[in-house]
Amino acid sequence: MKKLVILNACLAMSLATFAQNNADNESKDNSLTKSDSLRMDSIIHALPDVMVKGTRPIVKLKGAALTYDLPQLLKDHPVDNAYEAIKQLPGVTEENDALKLNAQSVTVMIDGKATTMSSEQLYSLLKSIPTNRIANAEVLYNAPARYQVKGQVINLQLKHNQGITALQGEAFGSMKHQSRNRYNERASLLYTNKKWEIDMLYSFSHGKNFYYTDNEFAHNLADGSSYSYVTRSDINGRNLSHNIRLGINYNIAKNHQISLAYTSQLADQKSTAESSGDFESLLKINTKSYLHNFRLDYSTPFGFSAGAEYTYYKSPDEQWVTSSLFDTEESYDITSKQNINTWKVFLKQEHDLGSNWGLNYGANYTTTRDKSSQENTITNQTEDEASLYIGATKNFGTKLMMEASLMEEYYHTTIWHEWNLFPTLSITYLPKAGHIIKMGISSNRNYPSYWSVKNFTTYAFGGYGKIVGNPYLKPSRELDASLTYIYHSQYIASLFMEYDKDGFRQFPYQSSTKKEMEYKFSNCDHIINSGLMLRAPLNVCKWWKNSLTLIGIYQNQKNSHFYDLPFDRSNWYGVAKWNGNFIIGKHLLLNMDGTIHTKAIQGVIDIPTSGYLNAALTWKPLNNDKLQVKAYCNDIFKSTENYLHDTYKGQHVINETHKDRTLGISLTYRFGGYKAKQHEKVDTSRYGI
């Protein structure tokens, strides 16, 4: 969690609104860009499925969900893993190393299972999972309470080989070069018979990385004095990470199953950032992290299911800083540690009441014990969350469907004690074959990371910057609404609105009384994102197939208590995403994809226009697709470089991050008719890892 971006702090904390998509997600391998939140940032109810007719349909309606045929959607796409597969869904983008749906946060689930693991650890696991195990993907813009999560959901459904005795597997290896070399190897095995399904996965990522940043600070004090600093920071990193998973399913009878899963993620990262210019500084960070997750699930053919989950996370790190910023040699040696234990239990029941009515209800309880320390300061935090919900589904003939639910939640910490109601409503209308009109409203609650509410301080930019925690940071309350129209099961238009009361963000602030810059999460009055998403296939001919996604977004962010610089800023920005496939021959495919976004804001930060263009050449020499070789180049024109500016009301902080294009090659071999299986993911979003 505590992978501190010291000399690139402003970059990391400012990408949340809509930083451009790093096409190769290179920052995830870089301990300096994987900062924690503080340190820089089902059973479907028995309603009939309605198939949307049309030419090569990619989506159908199932209950409250839009179900996408991922194997067809991914056809002729050089996608290696589940994370990249999700990014092919309409409206899905990557912002600040996180998946977004219509520029809003989204929860990824597997087989309808809500878990306690997410964020960077989830994405790391997704990248370790082969693509072909996905059967389809459900998209819910306003998830009902029976999913036991709130807000938008992408539910990956798996392929299961129940009743078939088989041993299947896959081996994968890749090398990528972006100034330095990085490598990834993984192996997967799946054994099934009439009663058992045993799934094993191991992946190993290792290598080095390099990039540099140009930083410019101009600081004006209330007494009239002013200071300016211009520096360049060279960042070198090395990382080793292991992902291990073992899943066991036992089929007692049809639709009657007990399953056990163990997930482990181990990482060791070392980073060095050396700055030169108006002052010199040297930063070294050593970080290790250990995550162990156990999950037990039980499901029955009469709609009852229950489960329990335990997650243990530990992350010690040490930071050494030397700096000549204030004309004297200063040094810091900071040791930090985080220990988190999380337990979760849940129950849920679904009934078919007849006459196209359905009823569902359930409960879940999560408790967390967080013992973290920095130097000689130790904090103990307990957090409890309990909820009850009830929901109903109804089919009014064959054209109109409705699902509504209500969840009551109790949230308790040493500071906050709150009861909250979360209503959800989803209405779907089918005017004629091939057309879907879907409307939904829902409410949600977002929680800060565990580390961001600690009263700890960390130094950055050679001692000029201070990253401080906020023990009084409160969860935010979010209201979401959407209206989606699907034409011929391929053309999609979606209006969306998100109103986040008390939404929290991290911004830089240059003090008016002393020579220091402070980073701190604070609650805004509100954060508003609303807009329109359009997606259409543009197939020129049999050998040239395209898709185009356009998103237009209105932003408004207001914070009336941000130090002595209250702000109320608005902005319109657009995103264009193109994907083109060129079928060169029976065994050869060229894929190109590009994205561009216009200027965006995050609080006092301006995020200039940028974009990227990627290309990949895939060769499948065998007719059964058991062997695949892919060569690619991401960010061909090196246009994803970040230029992030804070010049609001006398503030002056400018960061420019420069990375090289990425060249890579990968090889995949499958045996035994291997069909890749997805895994439920452990929610680590609040650990900041």
What do these predicted ranges mean?
Residues 20-22, 621-689:
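C-terminal beta-signal and adjacent terminal beta-strands/loops
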Residues 21-74, 94-96, 103-105, 151:
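Short, acidic, small-residue-rich periplasmic hinge/interaction motif at the N-terminus
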Residues 38, 49, 82-85, 122-124, ...:
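N-terminal periplasmic accessory domains that precede
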Residues 58, 83-118:
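Extracytoplasmic beta-strand/coil segments of soluble accessory domains associated
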Residues 115-142:
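Short acidic/polar hinge/loop motifs at secondary-structure boundaries
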Residues 180-208, 224-271, 290-294, 300-301, ...:
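Transmembrane beta-barrel wall of Gram-negative outer-membrane proteins
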Residues 196, 241-268, 282-423, 428-434, ...:
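Face-selective signature of the C-terminal outer-membrane beta-barrel domain
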Residues 445-495, 499-501, 519-530, 536-539, ...:
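Outer-membrane beta-barrel signature, preferentially recognizing the C-terminal barrel domain
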